[in-house]
Structures are given as structure tokens and as C-alpha cells.
Amino acid sequence: MGLQFRILYAKNDGKDGTSVFDLPQTANATGFCGSDSSSLTLTFHDDAFNVTFDFVKSARRTGASRFHVSAIEISYTELSSFFPGTKSPDGRRQVKNNTMDIFSADADKSYMCNTDMNITVTKDVSILVRKVQLQPFGVKSGQFSWAQVCSQDSGDKGGVNIAAIVIGVIAGVALLAGVFAYVIMSEKKRQDYRSLNSD
């Protein structure tokens, strides 16, 4: 899974700056797993940055349970190496969105998406997520369960199927048009032949 953070911040010169940085491979992952809720916290750059994803499991009308990310919280320090010219060097910030409904899948499956997704946490903070597979509940032997693919990925496959259907319909219409043209031409030749015989 790849995460890229984009954070707007105030600069000394009165202008706005944009800090863009990736989740390093050395990030530390912690969390907890409950029966209906779980969380994943990623900590990196000597605890200067923390991002927490809260997952919940809920029953649907069909009786099947599903999970999704319900909240994302990001706390960070405005380090000058990531926030050049910041108005608040070493200032600590915290943002949270409790109204998220992303990364949804059946509770007994994993969620997988290869398409890049831009997640808006607040008006000033967003996360670009790349090639994600996650499963907050029911992990067995450290392995993901069967993956439920996101609509963005399955939509691409659906586009291929639609193209095949359209080509098939066009070929069928062309074949029918050819058959009708042959029947009409045959009937016309037959009528011309009869009119010659009657003379």
C-alpha cells in the first residue's frame, strides 16, 4: 500500500504552502482488533507524523456484515524539512474526519483497489492511496481472505465487457442487414426474371 500526503499550510510570507510527502517503508504500524471495530495507526519520521484509520463492522439489511473506514485522524509536526517557510515551525497539528465511508467490503473478505484514490480528510489535508489491500476483521494465519475489488477496478473490466458487447451487436446488425439485402435482391431478380418470361 502506498500513501502520499498533501497538506496545505501557512507560510511566513503570508502565502500558502503545500507539503507533499510519501509514507516511508520504515513506518511503524500498530493498532487493535475488536469484534465490531478496529484501528490501524501508522507512525513515521520519529513520531512527527501519525495517521489512524478507524474501521467499523455493521450489519446490512441482507444480514451480511460489511466493514468500512469510518474515521481518519492525522497528527503531525510542521517540521521545516517538510513545511519549508512555515509560519509555525515545530507546531503540532491534528485533523480528523469522523464521517468517512471508504474501503468498504464484506466483513469476511479483504478490500483491494489498484486504482489511485484521492481521499479528502479536511479542506487542507488529503491522502492519495495507491494499490491498497486491507482486512480489519477475520484475518486467519496472517493471510488476506478472498479480495473484494473496488468499483474503480471492476469498472475497468466492465468497460472491456461493454466494448465486446457493442462490437457483437454491431456485427449482428451488419449480418442481419446483409441477409435482408440478399433476400431483397433475390426477390427483385426473381420479379425481373418473371417479367422477362411473361413478355
Model features per residue range: what roles?
Residues 1-149:
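Non-cytosolic ectodomains/luminal loops of secretory-pathway membrane proteins
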Residues 150-199:
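C-terminal single-pass transmembrane alpha-helix
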